[in-house]
Amino acid sequence: LDYKKFKDVLDVVSWDNYPSWHKKEEYLTAVDAEMQHDLMRSIRKEPFLLMESCPSATNWKPINKLKKPGMHLAASLQAVAHGSDSVLYFQLRQSQGASEKFHGAVIDHYGGDDTRVFREVTEVGEALEQIQETVGTSMRSQAAVLYDRENDWAIADVQGPRNVDMHYREAVQKNYRAQIGRAH
């Protein structure tokens, strides 16, 4: 969906964030998540809700890796730094059956509160308490990068003389990286 087309009928913008951390190019994963957060914030020019995140490992990627220590806190604070008013989870308690029984959760099958994942979720909550004055605030961007979802779809679906090496999203990310490089 092109969320911008729904901005006038939405009460709140939310999205589900499941970056593929712990790959060779970690920086690009971080930049992509950052760009997606900024896109969500730009829809209504106000804070959004991070509706779903996973404190440990997902169940549906080619390789499902447990986040390294501290990574969940970093990813959560990244969302807040880019306009999220929340860090919410799918799922609170790990499912008993079906495919999501292998999807990470705040409370795993063991059920205790003495796991690393549970401790790290607690750390996120404590960090958010310390910065609660940021809730509802927004920032004014100094630069803009246009991401046209319909253009992305059109290029992805093109059937013509050149069908390879047309990477719209990667081109937008490259421009986005150049802009954030200037900001830091």
Regions found by a protein language model. Name each.
Residues K7-D11, W15-H184:
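Carbohydrate-binding surfaces of carbohydrate-active enzymes
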